[in-house]
Amino acid sequence: MAWKTVRADEFCSFVTDGTHDSPKPQSQGRKLITSKHLKGDYIDFDSANWISEGDYQKIIARSAVEQWDILFSMIGTIGTIYLEKSPIVEYACKNMGVFKFAGNAENAFWMYYYLKSPQAKEYIQSHLRGSTQAYVPLGSLREMPVSIPDRETRNRIVSLLKPLDEKIATNRAINDNLMQQA
């Protein structure tokens, strides 16, 4: 089957970004995630700031993260991605792209792997802006071309990649455990 190319905002249900506000850190409440907390296959919640429930509600009213959304670091460190697999999401995000899929796991997994592709990385690199701190404009994320095969081919490719990612995550967890024991 032939592949087609569509814009990210046509493939996703919505492409948005997290808050640009800087809520005052609190001693408890909800976590506020930024690009530096994205570690690929997990989020480093330990180093994230707490924010008030009021600030959290204000942020998620605009850009709530849901299961199968992809977080994309778009300021500073560019291109780190995280696929939210949990049905319960209790954090807000700041200064990062959010590719939303309205619960469509198939499309989310395809986009997750596509964002790791040389084509996507080249597109992102060619759309960087900023002299002091690099960033990718939200409009560029929305307009990003996404190559898509037919559904059967897409699912076959994802079914080959998912077990490899799971093995990598398992090995990382083992390594982390060994480092803690040393």
Residue spans of the language-model regions?
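Well-ordered mid-protein domain cores that form the structural environment of catalytic cofactors
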Residues: 117-121, 145-147
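A generic structural signal for short beta-strands and their flanking turns/coil linkers
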Residues: 29, 47, 93-95
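Non-catalytic DNA-recognition/assembly elements of restriction-modification systems
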Residues: 1-18, 143-182
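A short beta-sheet element
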Residues: 34-35, 53-116
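Sequence-specific dsDNA recognition surfaces
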Residues: 5-24, 36-67
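A short glycine-rich beta-alpha junction/loop motif
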Residues: 74, 89-97, 109, 129-158
